């Protein structure tokens, strides 16, 4: 059972159909890691293969061994981010002392969400832009990413018997912090 968007073995295949070995996967990851750095200096629509390859100290031809275009690389990067952070955003909420110090718990959650958004701003900006433009692939990734926090807040609201709809309450809080 899939828990959300993630890269399947087919997504990791090189352009010639091979599944990369350890060195190939390291090169692929280096290209993914270079993308947010470049996005700090250019808009998503201006992001290009040459700039990513240069930042990764490799060639555009190497980029094309792993990704057909910039959009595919961004989908992979955003998918990886959502997989890694889905559970972490949930833990950010559930691993708090809401009984004896709810104000401090809320403060830590807000700070944690804002820190996450700041640290991953380039990729999250792309998720927001492409989602608003109607790209369902990016919207699905963004929704899955935020679902960890939303579900945890919904559970917390239901558990504490907060008046109103727990889903609405959770959605408002996540919307304000996202």
Language-model segments: which ranges?
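Hydrophobic alpha-helical connector segments
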Residues: 72, 76, 90-119, 166, ...
């Amino acid at each position: 059972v899939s828990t959300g968007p993630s890269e399947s073995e087919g997504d990791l295949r090189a352009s010639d159909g091979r599944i990369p070995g350890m060195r190939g996967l390291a090169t692929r990851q280096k290209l993914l890691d270079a993308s947010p750095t470049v996005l700090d200096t250019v808009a998503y629509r201006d992001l290009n293969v040459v700039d990513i390859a240069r930042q990764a100290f490799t060639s555009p031809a190497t980029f094309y061994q792993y990704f057909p275009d910039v959009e595919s690389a961004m989908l992979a990067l955003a998918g990886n981010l959502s997989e890694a952070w889905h559970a972490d955003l949930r833990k950010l909420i559930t691993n708090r002392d809401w009984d004896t110090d709810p104000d401090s718990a809320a403060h830590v959650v807000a700070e944690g969400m804002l820190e996450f958004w700041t640290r991953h701003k380039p990729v999250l900006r792309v998720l927001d832009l492409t989602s608003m433009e109607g790209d369902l692939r990016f919207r699905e990734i963004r929704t899955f990413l935020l679902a960890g926090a939303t579900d945890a807040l919904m559970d917390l609201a239901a558990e504490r018997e907060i008046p109103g709809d727990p889903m609405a309450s959770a959605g408002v809080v996540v919307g304000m912090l996202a």
